[in-house]
Amino acid sequence: MSGMRWKGLVAGVLTFALAGSAALGQTAGVVKLGYVGSLTGPHSGWDVPALEGMQMAVTEINGAGGFKVGGKAYRIEIVQEDAQSKPDAAATAAQKLLSDEDIHVVMGVLTSVPGVPVATQMAKAKVMYIGGFTAMDGIVGKPGNELSFRALDTDDTVAKGFVPVVVKELGLKKVGILVPNDDVSKTFVKAYQPLFSQAGVEVSMVEFFQPGTTDFAPVLRKFQGKGLDGMFIGYADPDAEAIIRQSLEVGDLPKKFVYRGGSGAPAVKYADKIDGFVWQILTRDLASSSDEKVKAWIDRYKAATKKDIVANTYWALTFYDAVFMLGKAMDAAGTTTDQAAIAAKLKGMVYDGVRRMSFDKDGHAVTDVDIGIIKGGKTYSIPEKVL
Amino acid sequence: MLEIENLSVSYGRNEAVRGISFAVPDASIVALVGANGAGKTSTLNAITGLVSSSGRIVSNGRVLTGLTTDNRVRLGVAQVAEGRQLFPLMSVRENLELGGYLCRAAESRQRLTVLMERFPVLAERADQFAGTLSGGEQQMVAICRALMSAPQVLLIDEPCLGLAPIIIRKVTAILRELHGTGLTILIAEQNASFAAAVADRLILLENGRIRAEGSPNEVLGQPQFRQAYLGV
Amino acid sequence: MLLDIIQTGLDGVMVGSLYAMVALGITLVFGLVGILNFAHGQSVMLGAYVCFFLVSAGHSFWVGAIVATLAMGVFGALLERAVFRRTLGDPFAGLAVSLGLIMIIENVAAAALTPDPRFMDAPVSGNFAVGPLLLSSQRSLVFVISSALILGFWLFLQYSTLGKAIRAMSQSRQGAALVGVRVDTVSRSIFAVGSALAGAAGALYASLFAVTPFMGAAPLTKGFILAALGGLGSVPGAIAAGFLLGLAESFGSRYLSASFRDGYGFIILIFALLFLPTGLFGAGKARV
């Protein structure tokens, strides 16, 4: 190809592009939005739906002509990297996104092991990052981390509304706590114990079991004959299911269970043998919702992904609303590149999307969540007003 | 009759037996004598197939070469191995019963009864762990265990090792008695005077080769004998 | 209080019987072949999956358990033929190979079956009262089955011809060969028998606990503690040690701390090695 013809082609393409954007009304820009998450490996059950939710939001925004900043329309383009459920791969993925100078905001990662290296690198590079994993709570709000956000509520935030609802729903008076002997459990036991007391429930014993325990019979015996009516059973599905199953086996133990995890799966098989099981849905209940906004979102999700709703699908709502909020924050800040200004606008913004959500002054999400309940053989959910 | 032709045994580069040939005539006792490491045990172990060997081994017209140990036992060859190799945590009865491992149960029971009648001490100790017996008693159990398979050829490695003189006399008596029943016996023995007392023929081994062969008096009188034993 | 102690004791012997089954296979293979088979735990895991999938497909637990046992018997025989036969006489090679096998089998299982824990429907559920005692139905069933298998296996070793040959071989390989025992064949069969026992233990584990690709690790470590505690190669030692460990864990978790559960076994082992350096039943006394 000769130099002349090449230049001519470039000019032609440019003209076409300009004409195309002119058709949208104004000269359109493109905002690159980074996504990092485990698209493969054991953590993909969280991060694949999370990416799907982001893609839905982006498609919807772009389909409506993009979002406006200072009267100019912008389209969003997602640049995605796979963290492979491993911390080293996650760090590499984060580096790749950081090397693209057009990326000013990154979202993704719902699990702590690959999440921590991503969040720390983003904070160090002063790039705005909205994550979802629990350990993010220890990063958000620290001096120097003003650009770090978490799109899911902290334990404390959820617990405040969760405990009173649970106590009322299950009619609890005296509970025992049986959780793994690890940092996560120790932190949330500290948060939940006083909340139970405030709700008029006596926490008569707390037992920590060795992580990886499969046989709970001996430790469950400690809870026998204590007049308990409920058990608080940690945050991991396999532990919770084993404890429920073995409580029924051992006998003479409470049949009401409070679960800090995000799924009703541990109790499904035992629904007609137990008196109650409650869990936390950190976004919205998709399985048995009566909320019109949720129902409409489900239809859009099915159309966009050609997938059915499964137990993990609700993680797709982690970043869905946050993408819209980001657009509004950029508009309010009048910039798509000044991260400090955008972050400042995001903090304190209240957004009534599929989730009703906001970010506090530190960057922690404060959002309404749903509480999942299995009782009397039925599965349903009730909304928890947090905001 | 047990015939050995050009038998060699080697462990890696170390040749323990170097192409020896000899025969044990029916109903006779032949003793392999020689110092430690002369190749006596290797020869016995090669005959029962515990170690691999080259050459030809024929027992009562049946070629044993290449057969597994259990098949050689089936063809009537039994061995009392070095160290007796009893099952120390099994009772005397179980040890003897295992001697009839390849035989029919009825035959085995019958032989056990006969042996216990012949050696009342076995019956007395029947329920005791073999490991708790005295050395002489253990030797007796080991020989009787080998007899349980009704062998035609019996190989015994060091029948007197570690035994008191009074016990050695008893073992001698037993071997003579077995000899009287027409059993073909090959023993490997370091104790030359014992070997001379029980055997019809002696074969002197040194460094895996036969140095002398003949009646006990012939072999004991030869200068090679003193050389092989005393290294002079 | 007394009632509680009895209940806790029963919990202990129930899991102890499972531990003993796994330790039995390890100690047998070591006693006869001199190989510490670290891949033994994988037979537990694969047996659990075989049972899980059969039960999930609508077959009864009994079909699942029997097929798991037989399948793991075949698996043990294949492992012996393909791998351990080549490492005979070289314990270090055997050790290295079995460690490698753990990695391969576990990771292939994790890739093919996903690492998600699965729970199988047990043939019986709930609990029943015996006087003032409240017993878990499935645990009682597991205890009965595993005790029957252990007792059956012990009787097999004591009284059957092959069982006597196995014991004889563990006490004197040469002596056994000279009475006509085919020592090679018996060595091979012991891999199959040990692995089949582990498969049966796996099916029983699956009826109580979660099935995961990594579930073989705990029974394996415990099996080794037990085999060492009982005196390597000793069948009565391994059985006694299995029940002892079950009791220690059960009483430790109940009356001390549940967060130290797996530590109790090691404490017993350390004390045993200090004060009974040759295992529960002394040096070479209580072999197979």
Question: Can you annotate each of these PLM segments?
Answer:
Chain B
Residues M1-V232:
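Glycine-rich phosphate-binding loops of nucleotide-dependent enzymes
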